[in-house]
C-alpha cells in the first residue's frame, strides 16, 4: 500500500536523522517551510508551532546561571527562526507560537524576549491557551489585554490549580490525577471562559476557537460532546449598535451650546 510504503520511508528517515543532528535540523526547517506553503494552499492565515528550547533547562535560577546565557540562547533561537518566519511571510501566514511549559516561549516575558531578537518580525504571533497559564499562576485575563494584537489562535482548554501543603506548581512528579495543577474537560475546571470570550471579542479576535481536550478524569467522548456545545454557548455575536442608540437625538453646534448653557 502506498501509505504503508510512505510511512516506512518516514521511519527510515527518522532513524537517519536521529543520528545526525545537522540533517535533523535541515529536515525540520524544510518541514516548516512546507507547512507555510500548505497553510497558504489551504487558505489559512495562521499556523501554530512550538518555539523549541535552549534555555528552558535553566528556568529555575539555581544553580546560578552564567551571565549572558539567556541572552545568547534567545539570540540563537531568533537566528534559527527568522528565515522560517520570512518564508511564512512570503506565503502570507502568521506563525503562532504556543506559549507552553518546556519551551523557551512559556510566558509573556519570554515572548517579548524572542520578539525583540527577531527585530519585531511581523509574523511572530501567539497561540493563546489559558490552561497553561493557570497552571503557572499567570493572569490569563490581563494577558489578553497586553498581547491581544499578537493572539491569532486560541485553544479552548480548561484546567484547575489546587495547591496543597505537599505540592504546588511543580507537581511533585505526581500522576495527572494527583497533581495540584491538572487539565480538565471544558466547564469542569476553574478558567473563566466567559471573560476570555468577552475580551477576545472586545479586541476583535476573528480566529478559530479550537477545542483541546486533555482531561485526566472524564472520557474523551463525553468531553468532545460537552465541549463543542460549551464553545458554541460562549461564542458572542458582536452587536452592530450600542444599547442606548435609541436615545440619540442627533447633535449640532448650536444644540450643544444650548445644552451647556452657552447660548
Task: List PLM regions with ranges.
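Single conserved hydrophobic/aromatic residue that forms the stacking wall/gate
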Residues: 1-7, 11
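Active-site acidic/histidine proton-transfer and metal-coordination neighborhood
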Residues: 12-126, 257-262
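Short amphipathic alpha-helices and their capping/turn segments at secondary-structure boundaries
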Residues: 30-46, 139-152, 194-202
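Conserved beta-strand positions in the central sheet of alpha/beta enzyme cores
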Residues: 48, 152-155, 210
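Acidic/histidine-rich catalytic cores of soluble enzymes
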Residues: 72-190, 239-243, 256
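A short, acidic, flexible beta-alpha connecting loop/helix-capping segment that sits on the rim
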Residues: 210-220
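C-terminal helical cap(s) of enzyme catalytic domains, especially alpha/beta-barrels
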Residues: 220-240
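Terminal-tail/helix-coil boundary detector
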Residues: 236-263
Amino acid at each position: 500500500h502506498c501509505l504503508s510504503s510512505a510511512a516506512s520511508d518516514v521511519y527510515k528517515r527518522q532513524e537517519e536523522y536521529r543520528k545526525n543532528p545537522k540533517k535533523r535540523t535541515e529536515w525540520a526547517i524544510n518541514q516548516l517551510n512546507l507547512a507555510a506553503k500548505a497553510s497558504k494552499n489551504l487558505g489559512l492565515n495562521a499556523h501554530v508551532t512550538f518555539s523549541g528550547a535552549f534555555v528552558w533547562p535553566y528556568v529555575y535560577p539555581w544553580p546560578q546561571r552564567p551571565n549572558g546565557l539567556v541572552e545568547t540562547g534567545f539570540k540563537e533561537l531568533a537566528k534559527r527562526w527568522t528565515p522560517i518566519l520570512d518564508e511564512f511571510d512570503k506565503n502570507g501566514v502568521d506563525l503562532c507560537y504556543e506559549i507552553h511549559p518546556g519551551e523557551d516561549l512559556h510566558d509573556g516575558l519570554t515572548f517579548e524576549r524572542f520578539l525583540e531578537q527577531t527585530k519585531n518580525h511581523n509574523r511572530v504571533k501567539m497561540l493563546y491557551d489559558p490552561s497553561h497559564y493557570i497552571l503557572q499562576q499567570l493572569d490569563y485575563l490581563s494577558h489578553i489585554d497586553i498581547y491581544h494584537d499578537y493572539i491569532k489562535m486560541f485553544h479552548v482548554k480548561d484546567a484547575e490549580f489546587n495547591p496543597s501543603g505537599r505540592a504546588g506548581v511543580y507537581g511533585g512528579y505526581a500522576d495527572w490525577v494527583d497533581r495540584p495543577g491538572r487539565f480538565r474537560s471544558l466547564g469542569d475546571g476553574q478558567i473563566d471562559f466567559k471573560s476570555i470570550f468577552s475580551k477576545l471579542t472586545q479586541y476583535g479576535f476573528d480566529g478559530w476557537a479550537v477545542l483541546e481536550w486533555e482531561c485526566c478524569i472524564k472520557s474523551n467522548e463525553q468531553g468532545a460532546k460537552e465541549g463543542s456545545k460549551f464553545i458554541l454557548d460562549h461564542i458572542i455575536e458582536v452587536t452592530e449598535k450600542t444599547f442606548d442608540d435609541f436615545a440619540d437625538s442627533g447633535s449640532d453646534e448650536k444644540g450643544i451650546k444650548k445644552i451647556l448653557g452657552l447660548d
